[in-house]
Amino acid sequence: VHRLEGGAEDHATPKLPAHSRHGPAPSRDSLRGLDWFVFFMADVQTGFGPFVSVYLTTQAWTQVDIGLVLTVGSLIALAGQMPGGAVVDAARSERLVAACGVIAISASAFALAAWPIFLLVLLGRVLHAAASCVLGPAMAAISLGLVGHAGIGERLGRNARFASIGTGLAAAAMGALGYLTSSRYVFFATAALIVPTLIALFRIRPGEIDPERAHGGKHDAGLRKLGEGLLALAGNRPLLILAACALFFHLANAAMLPLMGSLLTTRSSDWATVLIAACIVVPQLVVAAFSPWVGRQAQQWGRRPLLLVGFAALPLRGVLFGAVTDPFLLVGVQLLDGISAAMLGVLVPLVIADATRGTGRFNLAQGIVGSAVGIGASLSTTLAGYASDTLGSSAAFFGLAALGFAGLILVWTSLPETRPDAVD
């Protein structure tokens, strides 16, 4: 076995966490299975990004109907965060929950491609949103159940790397597929990805997922204690502060790229598509490169120093977006988005795991923070759009930067260091 605290990372083969009191280290087969499950899940979720509105437009849908379907999906995703986490906490098998979620998303993609009528598409979006609410917590629970707190930092970093690579490759492949054939085949391809996704999932050996570690402690097997769990978490100060910090971060962050995309279109219409694509790809490259390092350093340095770096990059990015006029330099500014994404993508679930250790409510807590993220992101685009229309795009970016700075101050002044002195 390898020590998690030092040494060069083996990029080809996941490291085995040290033997813990809960049982032996997970097998390489399980760890590789988790790598590829994360990768293919990112592929599947990418199929439901901007391709939905493009496809429905080609099917002669009105913008009102498209907007309604997307809004319903967003509302279900927001409302389902806490119930989704509670379902994973109550489940006896995280693999089974994840498999059901994958099947639901695949069915949704197939229905969307085969029968693009309003009712079926609406039901498909609801199904996809509900499945997504359990897949995120299930993936984190499987990770924690396999490696425990001793290895969760590096494991989350590895998850972020594979998710980032999967997202980037899937966006390129599905964009090419839609261009060469039609956007309908993007969703048939998404549905077909159920096969490698489930193969990867079932490479993870169920006996190696420690149920107590997966839930952050001993957990009730039913949903009847959901109220008790919520009350207990309502008194968890680090968790609530983290949720507030996440709300401020996404209140500032969610509107930045769409607003900048509009700005690029007006300043450089000929290059707009290429520049926007570059603004999406550049952060993914940063996340893929640095996420494992973030996971390792979080075990050595603690969570707060790295979180402060991730939060500090956001207001700096907002100020630069408001001040820089060269459209090509704006792509370079997106490197800061990659830094924030690498830091928060690893550290937010890591702090949740720290804060809920021993409670058995790790996944419900993920739902609470996920709800805060959803609220912040939902309000962000509305506030930024209003500010841009009334005060101008530069003022909107400076306003978003101020909100991001408020999140940074909250982390600096209120969020405690959660790294445990002794890990299992």
Give residue ranges: language-model regions.
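Juxtamembrane intracellular "pre-TM" segments in multi-pass secondary transporters
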Residues: 15-31, 207-242
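Helix-loop boundary and gating motifs at the non-cytosolic
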Residues: 23-74, 240-241, 245, 250-264
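Central cavity-lining transmembrane alpha-helices of secondary-active solute carriers
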Residues: 68-86, 281-293
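Helix-to-loop junctions at the C-terminal end of transmembrane segments
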Residues: 80-93, 178, 290-302
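Structural signature of the two symmetry-related core transmembrane helices
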Residues: 96-110, 305-320
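Cytoplasmic helix-loop-helix junction between adjacent transmembrane helices
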Residues: 124-164, 351, 358
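Symmetry-related core transmembrane helices of the 12-TM Major Facilitator Superfamily/SLC fold
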Residues: 185-202, 397-412
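A late C-terminal transmembrane helix in Major Facilitator Superfamily
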Residues: 361-389
